[in-house]
Amino acid sequence: MPAEKEKKKHKLIDIAVELQVSLDDIRSFVEELGYRTTNSTKVTDSVKELILDNYSDEKKKSDLHKKLKAEKNRKIQLLEKRVSPQADKFSKKKTAAKKEASQEKADAHAKLEPSIPEEAPAAIDIDDTPEVAPEIEIPSQNTQEPEPVEMDEVASAATLAVEEAPIAAAPTEEPMHNSEAELPESKIDSAEAVAEEAAPEVEVHLEPKEQEVQELNHAEEAETPTTEASSEETSAVMTKEGDSNDAQPFTQHEPVSRKTQNTTNVSEENKQHEKQPETLKSDKAMDVVQPVPIAEETAEQQLTEASSYEKKETNLQGENLETNEADAAQTEAKDDDAQSDSLQAEISRQQNEISNRFSQSENIAGLKVFGEIELHKKKRKRKKNFREQAKDLKQQMTPEQPKQEEKPVKKEKPKEREKPAAGKKEQTPGKKPVREDQKERVLQDGPARVIKKKPKKAVDEKVVDRNIRQTMMTMDDTNDSSARQKFRKIRKRERLREQEIEAAAKEAESKVLKITEFASTHELADMLGVTPKEVIQKCFKLGKFITINQRLDKETIELLSLEFNYEVHFISDVEATEIDDDPDLPEDMKTRPPVVTIMGHVDHGKTSLLDYIRNSNVVAGESGGITQHMGAYEVTLENKQRLTFLDTPGHEAFTAMRARGAQVTDVVILVVAADDNVMPQTVEAINHAKAAEVPIIVAINKIDKPDANPEKIRTQLADIGVLVEDWGGSVQCQEISAKKGTGVRDLIDKVLVEAELLELKANYSEDKLSRGVVIEAELDKGKGVIATILVQTGIINVGMPFVAGGSSGRIRAMLDERGNRLETVYPSQPVRILGFEELPQAGDLFSIMPSDREAREIAQRRQVIRREHEFRHSSRVKLNDIAKQVQEGQVQELRVIIKADTDGSIQALADGLMKVQTDEVKVEVIHRGVGQITETDVLLAAASDAIIIGFRVRPNVNAKKLAEKEEIDIRFYSVIYHVLEDIHDALEGMLSPELQEKVTATVEIRDIFRISKIGNVAGCHVLDGKINRDSRVRLLRDGIQIYEGVLDSLKRHKDDVKEVDSGYDCGLTLKNYDDIKVNDIVESFETVETKRKLVVS
């Protein structure tokens, strides 16, 4: 990876807004260049220039031109494929169609010549759904040249000519039209030629006068099907699109007077034609188009057939109609006869005109629209139903005499109805008598008519119910809409409130200054947004003198921030130099192996359990049989499932290691010996797991021992808040024997189940900057600094630059726990990395960096912050403090230099030594380091009067000779509790001894002798003990001490003696004191020094 890279300062989303191009298009273009992008990706100036060149206006025009040209060629090819096979078929059928045209014209004229007899009534096709009167809507003639018509359109138009009147015309396929890619003229001419051959034009000119239009509208009320020249019910809708794409429908309705077999056949053929593929539509259309102008039956036959059908219906309805209404029916029939006559005249005119049009041989294949007429638009009256049509027929065929008898009845009924029904709406004259007749017929005929009326009432009730439901639904919709409006208002107010809160939070956050402790004046000024001069002036006003590069303490930073109206939030060096990274993409996230930490008290079998799982013997390699290092191991099961295990020490001195293990793990296995109790380190491990919110699986070990009691362990765990599943809790528990392997496989299965529930995922993208944690670090003589890293996200390869705490470097090699070289490491995999410039601390974050320069900058900044922190917090001895300590003689200090094999061991030793010190004796670690003891360490110990503790390390040859010369005490240890014991004893020896007073003799004064030149001599008797000549004594009178001193002389008889035992008499004098009396007591005593014990609080 190059050391220098061009700075990325242009976001893709900003470039997309600038060019007015979709962000996805920009991303796809950049990815084609070989870059991996997201919505927040930044690019360099060179990449931005490439994007601008690609999406410039000239580039857009050229791309659009290419796209239009490709679309044009594609459509031309598609049209050629469609037209070529159809043209061959139509050319073959053209000759056959012309031959049949002459014969069909003759037949059509022969069948259309007979006119309708005057004496015959209008033919009526009685049907449940009466047909609409003949109506032809023709769109206005378009003078523009016809658009190219595809073969499918020709077939579709031909098919429309033979469909029944009430059936909608088959949809026509719009011609292929694209403003961007026009067809060449040669292709258009060929398409038009084929279309003209396949669909000859039929010219229809209808120009009815306004009076005729009104007659047609009036005829709709009593519409009756009439004879037709055609044998089919035809309905055609033709759409012609102009350049403006405006389409107007052309509809032709022709009433049908019969239902012939040809009509059924044509309808079936039309249905089949719609289901067939487009390639077969044109052939089917030609077959259907041919019989269009042929009329198989004459109008007279149609009328005869309609009359017979009419008589049958009339006989059925005549039985249920009242005879007393005949007169009213006759009056209404006169109006119907007039309307029928006008309707028949119009129909005859249209039939003659249509037959003339079909007489031309060129019109035999279809229709062509030349214009459109607009009929008089007004509200049409209601169509008569089947019963009303039957009533009209009966009135026409009923004799006149019954009609005259019933005339008075008709005159009286309207008068009776007008009074109660004055406020009601007026009904049609033909509909109301029928309803009255039905009501009266129900009363006269009884149940027979009631049966027919019930469905009518049920329909009415249904309509009412439907109207009620619609009204209720409308009301509900209104209520729902009002409720939705209220909800929208509430939601809007909530959004506004949230926006106000966010704005306030942002404003408050903008006034919070996040800074590290011991920042320089220049750095503080940059974060405050002011010049360093202003900061220095503020400090001058506050009475402090600082420089621009001076490091400021915590109090000064807080004071200056308040002066500039800022709040201060102090952060660590790692947070200050945190590296921003792109968010993880869902496609990059994959399931990762779980990380399992084994925790528990010392000697409960943690490492033995791991040895059984790994099929190794780690315990044999540990000094004293206890774990003193934090190990990371990867285990592969039989099903290729991978697990990562972290083995933590159980000794109380390794608290930091256990806390570190709980923070980076996914699952904790808590090992408790069944033959022991829940120990303090067990409780500590549980607290670490709870603090890290990590699930716990309890493993009760050593169940193979005779004195094992798993139930006692469960009880003790429940007392401290860990309730296992067997007792109704949520913590899994498994009884195992790490020595024999009993239950170990079940324990692993429970770990896998717990990991599956956690849904552990990590980013496996190679573009992701990897992250990890330093588990342990050591200094090897041949390899240099080696750190054990647990990868958390991303993929690590050899040669990548990195930073870990205050150390940086480039990966030179990667090793697994067995020393095998690795080229690539994935998430949740432990690895030993070589290439650190300095020794990192256990627990530091390991981060892959884009370049060596960035890694070095971050590492140097962290080192400055840490050095300043150590310097400011180092203990400084003042002269007054030294004088006070000398006067009191209480405080003793043991200076220590610690050298160990790993950084974790150093931390454990330092923490352990801090715990054994007291207020009178203290331990000061003046230097700590990883690696062997060097000459520098010896010189430092000689200058500071310190001892050197080597934990699993040895001095080099020169250091050993220098230590012997300077008489420096170097202690070597391999087990941590041996170090702590010796330091404990040394601190006890440094304690001042405890002084205790012991009474050696009690002497009673019985007589006093006065001797010249000597003074008063006391004659005494030794009551208890033995009084010595050198003993200190005190004189007690009535229990009150009046003198304390030494003896001046001690004699027995006349001889000087050194001591007098109990029960003997003696004489004594007190030095410089003569005020003695009879019965005074003299006590001799001595002070005894007692060695003190070091009591650690």
From Swiss-Prot:
Region of interest: G2: 625-629
Transmembrane segments: none
Compartments where located: Cytoplasm
Signal peptide interval: none
GO CC annotation terms, alphabetical: cytoplasm
Basic and acidic residues bias spans: 97-112, 174-190, 202-221, 268-286, 402-443
Identification of the protein by name: Translation initiation factor IF-2
HAMAP family: IF_2_B
Residue span of region Disordered: 79-458
Disulfide bonds: none
G3: annotated span: 647-650
Keywords, ordered alphabetically: Cytoplasm, GTP-binding, Initiation factor, Nucleotide-binding, Protein biosynthesis
InterPro entries (alphabetical): EF-G-like_DII, IF2_II, IF2_N, P-loop_NTPase, Small_GTP-bd, T_Tr_GTP-bd_dom, TF_IF2_bacterial-like, TIF_IF2
UniProt feature, compositional bias: Low complexity: 157-173, 224-236
SUPFAM superfamilies with a match to the protein in the record: Initiation factor IF2/eIF5b, domain 3 (SSF52156), P-loop containing nucleoside triphosphate hydrolases (SSF52540), Translation proteins (SSF50447)
